[in-house]
A protein has these predicted regions:
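Short, charge/polar-rich alpha-helical segments
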Residues: 1-21, 44
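Amphipathic alpha-helical coiled-coil segments
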Residues: 16-19, 23, 46-70
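Charged, low-complexity interaction regions
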Residues: 30-41
């Protein structure tokens, strides 16, 4: 794997770590929020979007880590 791909994969993993940290912060806040409020709905929506971004970041990092080039 080229150094550029290694760096890119590391950046995606680092960003995924930041996303996961924020997801966990929001989940903690969600647990303390009444589920019958618009705040709960808003938080749940933000968490769902961040979870998608997290999954995409991990997927991209794995792809870059395992890319061998095609012929």
């Amino acid at each position: 794997m080229s150094e550029a791909l290694k760096r890119m994969a590391a950046e995606y993993r680092a960003n995924a770590g930041l996303l996961l940290k924020r997801i966990n912060e929001l989940k903690s806040e969600l647990a303390q929020t009444d589920c019958k409020t618009s705040d709960w709905t808003r938080l749940r929506g933000r968490i769902m979007i961040l979870e998608i971004l997290y999954a995409d970041s991990i997927s991209t990092a794995r792809y870059l880590e395992n890319y061998h080039g095609g012929n």
